[in-house]
Amino acid sequence: MSQLPLELGLSFNGGDILFQLLAMLILLALLKKYALGPLLNIMKQREDHIAGEITSAEEKNKEAQQLIEEQRVLLKEARQESQTLIENAKKLGEKQKEEIIQAARAESERLKEAARTEIVKEKEQAVSALREQVASLSVMIASKVIEKELDEQAQEKLIQDYLKEVGESR
């Protein structure tokens, strides 16, 4: 087995291998210091930035959810308040309607009572005027009867004539 590289025409030089190994280690150290370090720093910064963006997005999402919930609560309160206002307006309208109806009824009763009073007053005046006319007619009839001594038929005719006169004078 140790003869295999010699048979193929390959020879191993320990110094070359050591030199190449040393050069490789130096190259890796330089890459780590100048390329891998900054690259890892950039990747770390990118990772931190993405994590920060995710955290910020989650916080904004939570804030948005809170705002949505607050808006729902405010909307619910506004609906309840508007419903209360509508109910109060309906109650006030009903109350005013009842007050107007009561006022109209009271006014109607007042007008009826005033009309009744006026009717009674006019009736009393008419009765009084009628009594005066009857009294004056009675006096006139009595004076006519006294002036003339009339039989029953003549008296009836005289009364009818006076009643016609009274009817025409009205």
Swiss-Prot record:
Subcellular location: Cell membrane
InterPro entries on file: ATP_synth_B-like_membr_sf, ATP_synth_b/b'su_bac/chlpt, ATP_synth_F0_bsu_bac, ATP_synthase_B_chain
Keywords, comma-separated and alphabetical: ATP synthesis, Cell membrane, CF(0), Hydrogen ion transport, Ion transport, Membrane, Transmembrane, Transmembrane helix, Transport
Family annotation (Pfam families): ATP-synt_B
SUPFAM superfamilies per record: F1F0 ATP synthase subunit B, membrane domain
GO cellular component: plasma membrane; proton-transporting ATP synthase complex
Transmembrane regions listed in the UniProt entry: 15-37
Disulfide feature: none
Cited Gene3D superfamilies: F1F0 ATP synthase subunit B, membrane domain (1.20.5.620)
Single Gene Ontology MF annotation: proton-transporting ATP synthase activity, rotational mechanism
Membrane topology field: Single-pass membrane protein
Annotated function: F(1)F(0) ATP synthase produces ATP from ADP in the presence of a proton or sodium gradient. F-type ATPases consist of two structural domains, F(1) containing the extramembraneous catalytic core and F(0) containing the membrane proton channel, linked together by a central stalk and a peripheral stalk. During catalysis, ATP synthesis in the catalytic domain of F(1) is coupled via a rotary mechanism of the central stalk subunits to proton translocation. Component of the F(0) channel, it forms part of the peripheral stalk, linking F(1) to F(0).
Similarity comment text for this entry: Belongs to the ATPase B chain family.
Subunit record text: F-type ATPases have 2 components, F(1) - the catalytic core - and F(0) - the membrane proton channel. F(1) has five subunits: alpha(3), beta(3), gamma(1), delta(1), epsilon(1). F(0) has three main subunits: a(1), b(2) and c(10-14). The alpha and beta chains form an alternating ring which encloses part of the gamma chain. F(1) is attached to F(0) by a central stalk formed by the gamma and epsilon chains, while a peripheral stalk is formed by the delta and b chains. The F(1)F(0) complex interacts with SpoIIIJ and YqjG; YqgA is found in the same complex.
Entry protein name: ATP synthase subunit b
Protein's gene: atpF
